Amino acid sequence: MPLSPDPYSALRHAAKYVQQFRRKTFVVKLGGAMLSDPRLRRAACEQIALLWTFSIRPVVVHGGGPELDTLCDALHLPVEKVAGRRVTSAPVLDAAKMVLAGKLHTDLLADLQAAGVPAVGLSGVDAGLIKARKRPPVMVTEAGATEGKLVDYGLVGDIEQVDTRVVEHLRSADYVPVIAPLSGGTDGAVYNTNADTVAAALAVALSAEKLFFLVQVPGLLKNVSDPSSLVTLANLTDLATMESTGAIAGGMKPKAHAIRHALVGGVGSVHLVSGVQPNALLEEVFTNEGSGTMVVRENAQKPAGAVG
């Protein structure tokens, strides 16, 4: 958070947000690329710890794509993604279990504990938290393509139901749930499910005040190669425009879908925030200016840096 010439003024300013968000639910999704860097992972955990200290109720969801890619390479398994989403064979699913519910998950829990957060790890399989069905083959038109193609994503689950009872039980005892993006089928199958999708579904089911995506860039960018083209405020119409112009592509497309699902489902706002810039999450929560992009269903006024 930027230093103020008058630190007491900064504290008074932040205090109104502390009061406003007290006991509110924030779902925080940590990107896999950031989690692969222990320094960035610990910095994120320290920010989450401060939210918890201020009686904000965080629920953490994590990805793990880069570490899964690394393990697949080591195991000589193909890494295939279409429109930003992973194709998951049975061997790749086994690797995903090792990473998402294993090493990465445990390392994140350890760092949260070290930061003072009473974190408890779950996957979507635990207590039937995330119920899914296998995604059927779908037609996908990738960026730059003129025609779509039929894609079978393999053992990927589309969410059908979210049962938040285990999460609510943990939160009632002042624990912080940390959720890996695996889901369970009614037939006992386990599926790989996009972490952005899981975060949005949980945010809706928990009636979250806010959903945060911590990413490698400052937020939504009008020009993906220009960090200074940050969009500070956007609505769903703006989001659709950025998708149509190609400003949102690749791995950002699942995020756009998740943002839309969350906002239509009643989440107050969705924020894309840097997981690299120091204290960007805290700055987004506790200052007027914020640090990244806030997306809402509709906005009447747009400050400088907004779309349009």
Swiss-Prot record:
Its main location: cytoplasm. Pfam families: AA_kinase (PF00696). Coiled coil: none annotated. Pathway: Amino-acid biosynthesis; L-arginine biosynthesis; N(2)-acetyl-L-ornithine from L-glutamate: step 2/4. The keyword Transferase applies. It comes from the Bacteria. GO terms for cellular component: cytoplasm. GO terms for molecular function: acetylglutamate kinase activity; ATP binding. InterPro entries: AceGlu_kinase-like_sf (IPR036393), AcgluKinase_fam (IPR004662), ArgB (IPR037528), Asp/Glu/Uridylate_kinase (IPR001048). One of its GO terms (biological process) is arginine biosynthetic process via ornithine. It catalyses: N-acetyl-L-glutamate + ATP = N-acetyl-L-glutamyl 5-phosphate + ADP. Disulfide bonds: none annotated. Substrate binds at residues 64-65, 86, 192. The record marks 29, 255 as: Transition state stabilizer. Keywords: Amino-acid biosynthesis, Arginine biosynthesis, ATP-binding, Cytoplasm, Kinase, Nucleotide-binding, Transferase. Catalyzes the ATP-dependent phosphorylation of N-acetyl-L-glutamate. Belongs to the acetylglutamate kinase family. ArgB subfamily. This is Acetylglutamate kinase.
